[in-house]
UniProtKB/Swiss-Prot annotation:
This is Uracil-DNA glycosylase. Its main location: cytoplasm. It comes from Yersinia pestis. CDD domains: UDG-F1-like. The gene is ung. Excises uracil residues from the DNA which can arise as a result of misincorporation of dUMP residues by DNA polymerase or due to deamination of cytosine.
Length: 228
């Protein structure tokens, strides 16, 4: 891949597509109608802002944003500082404690330090109405995030995709396993984590795969930003 390729180069043209304009117009109209939509407008595309195309080492695919106040900020599974870790993230931490030597469960759920190291925290749907899970499914976001996965598949090599649950695994069918690595497990939700997410060792496996490619492993201990 040419290291100069950016998200703008490979998916920028999506902004001109009718489906994309329709999706953004729907979200804007819902906000104008007084509905609370998460995440805030400025945060919808945070995953791409924090993890540029040529920096992506790992992709963790989520479904849609958290739908409670002050949780979602554009990164899958992550919540803003000061908000308790939701149950799925609690199970991710539980797995990290057993998988990564020295990992200590943080008292927050802010995963931006992962994104800054090359972990693309991508939800397949990028907005949600407050209190209504999956309310923005089938608007058009899925088409956009399929294009994102296709761009990674085509323009990068050796990316590690963590696909948790059937939704993510279906989404990942287009990934060429001769060019990339796929780690599959049940979803970390309390409904399914005990069926094999806990014990999957995806985080240590990802670091082994990165080291085999002479890449810096991920420091999975989430860090809060230093207070200025």
């Amino acid at each position: 891949m040419s290291p100069s390729l950016t998200w703008h180069d490979v998916i920028g043209q999506e902004k001109e597509q009718p489906y994309f304009k329709d999706t953004l117009a729907y979200v804007a109209a819902e906000r104008r109608a007084g509905k609370t939509i998460y995440p805030p407008q400025k945060d919808i595309f945070n995953a791409f802002r924090l993890t540029e195309l040529d920096q992506v080492k790992v992709v963790i695919l989520g479904q849609d944003p958290y739908h409670g106040p002050n949780q979602a900020h554009g990164l899958s599974f992550s919540v803003l500082p000061g908000v308790p870790a939701p149950p799925s993230l609690g199970n991710i931490y539980k797995e990290l404690v057993t998988d990564i030597p020295g990992f200590q469960r943080p008292n927050h759920g802010f995963l931006q330090s992962w994104a800054e190291q090359g972990v693309l925290l991508l939800n397949t749907v990028l907005t949600v109405e407050a209190g209504k899970a999956h309310s923005h499914a089938n608007l058009g976001w899925e088409t956009f995030t399929d294009k994102v996965i296709a761009a990674l598949n085509e323009h990068r090599e050796g990316v590690i995709f963590m696909l948790w649950g059937s939704h993510a695994q279906k989404k990942g069918r287009i990934i060429n396993t001769e060019r990339h690595y796929i780690l599959k497990a049940p979803h970390p939700s309390p409904l399914s984590a005990h069926r094999g997410f806990l014990g999957c060792k995806h985080f240590s496996q990802a670091n082994q795969l990165l080291q085999q490619q002479n890449q810096q492993p991920i420091d999975w201990q989430p860090k809060l930003p230093a207070v200025e």
